[in-house]
C-alpha cells in the first residue's frame, strides 16, 4: 500500500458516508423506506469510543422525509449496510436512532504501518495546485521588534507550515514599509539627533511625535562617525535623505538577522518603495478611477468610496487613521491634494500585486487585532479593483502578556525599556518561544510565562513533548543493545495491540493528517501543538501500561512499531514548528 498522503480518519469518514448513503438507496429500492430525497446528514467521530469510531444521525435527519421514527429508519438502513470488504466490521443502533460504526483491525493496522513507513506521515495533498501567500510580522524597519512581532512571527511561520503540510504551495513574505509617513518621521528623527550631536538639544529639540528611542541616537552617531559634521550646514531634506539611506538598510539587515535567529526564513522580502517607484500605486489608483470606485475632490485629492465597498465584509463604523486615532468611516483619501499617495493606496497596490500580478489563490495576512478596522476596507478594496475580496484573508492576533512570578512584566531587566524580540530570545530558549506562541488561537490573548519557558521538566509543554521523543529514542536504543530489532511494517498486526492505551494511541495517530487539514483550513496552528501534547501524553500512558522489552513475538513488534510511529509524528510536528528534536535529554 502507498501511504503517501494517507489520511486514515478522512478515509473512514468518507467510506462511512458512502456506506450509509448506499444503504439508504437500497432500502428505498426494496420499499423498506418510501421514495424521498435524503437530507444532509452528519458522520463524525464520537467523543466516547463506546459510541463507535464513527457515528451518524442519518436516521434522525431522514425522519421528516421518510415519515417514520428515527429508530425504524436506522434499522431499515443497517439491514442494508454492506460492511464486507470495508474498513468497518460491525455496527449498532443506539439511543433514538444513532448509527454507530466500529472500525476493523485492518484499519488500525494501516494506521500504524502508515505512520512508520511514511517519514512524512501527516502530509496531505488537499491543497495541491493552490498558491497561498502568507505575510507576517512586516514590522516597521524604524525600530526594534516587539512582543506582537514575536507572536506574529511564530504564528505566521507555524500557519505557513500547516498549509505546506496540507499540500498548498506556500510563499512566506515580509512587507518592508520603506516609504510613506513612517520613513519621513524616521528620517526627521535621525536628522535631528544627528544635529544635536553638534548643536545640542536646546538648539535642535526633538518633537514629541518623533521616534524617541536610543536606537535612533545610535544610528545618528554611526552616521556622524563616517561623515563628521559635513551635513550640519546642508539642507535638512538632503540630510534626511542621506541619513535614511545609511540607517534604513542597517535596520532591515537587523530585522533579517533577528528573524533568522528566530528560525524564520522568508521567501520574499517585498519593498513598499518598489510599488511607488514602478508606478504600481498610480496604476491601481487610475484603475479605481476608471471603475468609479474613486473620484476627484474639489481640492484635487483622489477619494475612494470605502464604506460602499467595505460594507459587505462587516460593520465599518470606524477606521484607524494614519496617526493611530479612530474616526467615522467615510470616503477615504487615496492620493492627497499635493499628489502624494496615502499608505492605504500603497496597501491596495500591494495586495493587487499578490492576487493579480503574482496570481496567488489566497493572500493571508497576520495582523495585530488593533488593525481590525482595516479588514473590511481592505477586502472591499479588492472587490473595487475587480478582484474577489474573499481571496484576501486576515488573521487577527491578540496581544501578549509577559508574566513572571504570576505578575505582568513590561520592562526589560537589561535595558529598562519595553521588551523586544531580542530581549525575549536572550532570556528564554527559542524552542519555548516558538512553541508557546503557537499554543493559543490567534484570537485569544496569550499569557507567556517566562518562568515556565525556562523550566526543564514536564510542566513546560515543549520540554514534555521533546522528552517523549527522547524517551522513545532511549527505548529503541535499549532494544537494539539487547539484539531486538524491528522486522518491518509488513509484519505489523494491530489485532494483537489490545490494551486500551494502545488502541487510544492508534486512534490518536490516525487523526494527525486530519488535524493538519483542519489547522490549515481554520488558520489555527495551535491545533497541532495541542495535538502534539495529546500524543505525548498518550504515549506516556502506553509506556507505563505496556511492557516492550519483556513482550514477545507479534506483540513486541507491534509495540516497537507504535514507538516508531509516535516518534515520527512528534518529530514531524516539532520540525514543522522549527523546534529542536533531541534524542537524549
Q: Which stretches of residues belong to each language-model region?
A:
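Short, charged, solvent-exposed linker or helix-capping segments at domain edges/interfaces
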Residues: 110-115
